[in-house]
Swiss-Prot record:
One cellular component (GO) term of this entry: plasma membrane
Residue ranges of the TM segments: 4-24, 38-58, 68-88, 101-121, 137-157, 175-195, 214-234, 259-279, 290-310, 323-343
MF terms (GO), sorted A to Z: rhamnose transmembrane transporter activity; symporter activity
Subcellular localization(s) per the UniProt record: Cell inner membrane
Reactions performed catalytically: L-rhamnopyranose(in) + H(+)(in) = L-rhamnopyranose(out) + H(+)(out)
Gene that encodes the chain: rhaT
Cross-referenced InterPro entries: L-rhamnose-proton_sym_RhaT
The protein's name: L-rhamnose-proton symporter
Species for this entry: Escherichia coli O139:H28 (strain E24377A / ETEC)
Amino acid sequence: MSNAITMGIFWHLIGAASAACFYAPFKKVKKWSWETMWSVGGIVSWIILPWAISALLLPDFWAYYSSFSLSTLLPVFLFGAMWGIGNINYGLTMRYLGMSMGIGIAIGITLIVGTLMTPIINGNFDVLINTEGGRMTLLGVLVALIGVGIVTRAGQLKERKMGIKAEEFNLKKGLVLAVMCGIFSAGMSFAMNAAKPMHEAAAALGVDPLYVALPSYVIIMGGGAIINLGFCFIRLAKVKDLSLKADFSLAKPLIIHNVLLSALGGLMWYLQFFFYAWGHARIPAQYDYISWMLHMSFYVLCGGIVGLVLKEWNNAGRRPVTVLSLGCVVIIVAANIVGIGMAN
């Protein structure tokens, strides 16, 4: 396995670790509605950071974006909005299926759709079937899916042992939402594929290869921001028990505390895709769609590890922890199989 591929896998692991940890600051926000908290964090992660970093990277910010036709930018934006819809469905999936089943189904579907639809759309799926490296890579995707399934099973055992139930269990509604979440969340993978002309233009301007994907985030995350912020603001305006004004009428120290923690959560959310861009840059071009598989499987891996570190599994008993550990090992094996496949 080449050093470039190894570093690509490593940066995807770092990005996934940030994704697994980003909600921790949000949990410490006090006396704010979820909608206000999510909006503040989202403004940081989807608007401020993408724009600020792109302004630092690009020699002429406005000239860069105005150089693209609407036919180039619109698919990137719409796929970003597609991801935004998946993001909202994610929370509803947890509500109706519970954390473990919801995450397992949603992540499993988005892993498959986001990874395999890209080469199918690009007409490159034959590379996976007809080459040794491609078949090895496909095997890695399958093993990763098995690993996600094992971790999901561990979560179910934990919830059963600890008496944790879904907020409002509804299998039919939850499965529909989980499938929608999985499909729509893959929009981020499709957006990265559609944004290749933007990456090439950034490279032509002298932007370091590690950073060429970052300017496209202004458009991708702009699409996601409109969906997420629109959803939050509509709820803040229409739901009787929610009030943006009330949330910002608290004591000043508490408001500052909440804003800083929400901003930190937003920063950590953004960092997942900052390092995703680094990992993506190191993956061989013919296998760039594997970035999504690495990110999503590592997200499940890191989520399990973070749960162990935070002692969320302390009262779950030995069997769930053993199954979780097995699932994590399988995901690590999958990453190595994919790496070997890409090297071939």
